[in-house]
Amino acid sequence: MNNPDRLEEQIGNIECYRGVMLANHTSILFSNEPDISLLNNQGTTVGIIEVKGGADPAGALERYGAAKKSFEEGLRRNSDVRTILVASCITSEVDNRIKTDSTISAYFNLTEILSENSRQYDQFVQEVFSLLPAE
């Protein structure tokens, strides 16, 4: 039975929920920096995702720099961590920098991964869940 009062209480405490533990005891955590952390079943961070949703091309380089800073910190803590950038605006300049940037393991266009019928969506899901194996 659903209790609407309980639901309101849970929604009121939404800031307390930082993530989810999957059935295989891996976790997906949400925070300010990095935006998303992927933890294996030992609690080790194996992936970091930065989401940059700004659509203004003039700010694309700044958003890339902010993501890079977060990735550098994650790599400083664990040199084996995979870093994934998800951005809605990747200019040609940012694209060129990403392609030569060793701190970024993979990157995806936010608009394209929001469509379940896109190849980018499939690649993104595969990338994330390859870090959180079901074993």
Language-model segments: residues:
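Catalytic core segments in nucleotide and nucleic-acid processing enzymes
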Residues: N2-E135
